Amino acid sequence: HMGLCFLGIASMSVLGVGGTVLLMFGHGASVALLFMLSNAVVNRTGEWDMFKMGGLYKQTPNLAAFFLAATLASLGLPMFANFWGELSILASLWNFSPTICALAATGLIISAIYGLRAFANVFMGEPKDAIAPKFSQIPDLTFAEKLPAVILLAALLFVGFCPKAITSGLNADLSAIPTLTK
């Protein structure tokens, strides 16, 4: 996603740079949430290898729901902040070079496959041998873990529904971009 941000800046367009600001916010919030939740998974299972997990949804439904929401936000699903950033950058790239836009979109599709695969390996299916003995003792998220998750997810949704909350303050600065490219 940071590569997409660089492409948005390189487009030297109001749409591309504005999209970059939105994507940087969305990426920061969604990745912070994913890191926090990944740490919760590792602390609960004692396992770093996602291919040795599985089935955690049954034991930790809140953790799974937040992880899925963070993954979908990171993928740029509509209603999350990342969506508007990615859409704006891709639109600016289309105006610049449809080929570069297509390559960037392909990268986003590959990223989506990896994100959904990680979720499926950790939370879906049956518990693997590495975590099966302690599976019934794995706790769900605590209140202290849910609170920051709710705050980050709410921020992602708020900006997803109201992207102008971030971009409205940038209009004067972004409008100067066309004069920089002459």
What annotation goes with each model-predicted range?
Residues 1-138:
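Functional transmembrane alpha-helices
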Residues 60-62, 116-182:
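Cytoplasmic/organellar membrane-interface segments at the starts of transmembrane helices
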